[in-house]
Amino acid sequence: MTNKPSAATGRNVVVVGTQWGDEGKGKLVDWLTEMSQGVVRFQGGHNAGHTLVINGVKTALHLIPSGIMRPGVKCYIGNGVVLSAAKLFEEIEGLEKAGVEVRSRLRISEACPLILPFHAAIDIARETFREKGGTEKIGTTGRGIGPAYEDKIARRALRVQDLKYPERFAAKLRELLELHNFVLTGFLNAPAVDFDTVYNEAMLHAELLKPMMADVSRELNDAHQAGANLLFEGAQGTLLDVDHGTYPYVTSSNCVAGNAAAGAGVGPGMLHYILGITKAYCTRVGGGPFPTELDWENPGTVGYHLSSVGAEKGVTTGRSRRCGWFDAALLKRSAQVNGLSGLCITKLDVLDGIEELKLCTGYELDGQTTDILPMGADDIARCVPIYETMPGWSQTTVGVTEYDKLPAAAQRYLQRIEEVTGVPVHMISTSPDRDHTILLRNPYAA
């Protein structure tokens, strides 16, 4: 494995989560970066949370691509990302304190919409308003992601490039703040956001951002032509996609592989291999339907085992993740909308010691059976899972790096996932550590 580009055009891999996020994408992106020269974020914002464990040291990233932990690898934030400059510099400073060089290796698209303080204020006020009104909360992270995307779609967003022109920025900000303060004070019963505070902070960030501003689309295309291997790092998961997820309990961007092209400024022909990251069981943070959910709060239950052994706490919010059995019918939907080339099964080791495993292969819905997850939260909430029961294993799989050394029951479990979903398993993760990975087929050589 090497970080040197090939003589011909590079080969590019897209990494996406196939469930509700938190599948372990960060570790796999970091691992695959050993074979790439550039890592690209193409959607979401600092609502994402990627945890890397390298030589026993845990690092949490929210906005900066996971490839930053590999010396010499360039990292790109594409136009599909909504950018909080405040959170970006908080993250940069934390990495620099740990001895990681960031600023010379990070390129930020000038077309990124900005997340500003009033976006988070609206996000939080809306969730409070829903709760007081007796409506179930969406379960947002409260970081302003949704409101920032709303401004983008409404064609009124302030973008990174606007920071280069203070007078233009001020005029746009004043107009935008007038609208949002009207909503905050007149509808959501929340305090107004001060113009000067927002403007002055933005101008401080502008000077720091300027050296990293770039035409990311052009740089990625040039790097590809020069032979660089690129890795497109998805955030959240397919079932949180604004179109294909459990709507309305979703995020505000497209999390599927196809958005790697639009969110980074490359053609779809540059996406050569799609790797779907999938936990060996299911988890979900926040509200919304979850067909295979177990009792994960009471000791002695399988769900509690998954929650405690899997350390299922959200990286971004610290909220406990809901836990349940593996859902192959859900994964079949994810495979369809992403065009998956292969799977990486993570957290296989968490299943160690569970005597009997269940795998959902379909659902009963309104008197009918279906072998694929329906569209939309209302139908999914009415689904009754159809399970296959499989034997578990008592041997430890922690740190196993060869497929043949996995227990026979673990191998059969993985094979059944392949059979039901129609997608081959190409990688398996057996602990959070970077090196505890089984490689069956290299995405960069496939």
From Swiss-Prot:
GO cellular component: a single term: cytoplasm
Binding site for Mg(2+): D22, G49
Residue numbers binding GTP: 21-27, 49-51, 321, 347-349, 429-431
Binding residues annotated for IMP, in chain numbering: D22, E23, G24, K25, N47, A48, G49, H50, T141, R155, Q236, T251, R319
Coiled coil: none
PROSITE patterns documented for this protein: ADENYLOSUCCIN_SYN_1, ADENYLOSUCCIN_SYN_2
NCBIfam families in the cross-refs: PRK01117.1, purA
Stated family: Belongs to the adenylosuccinate synthetase family.
Protein name per the record: Adenylosuccinate synthetase
Natural source organism: Polaromonas naphthalenivorans (strain CJ2)
Gene label: purA
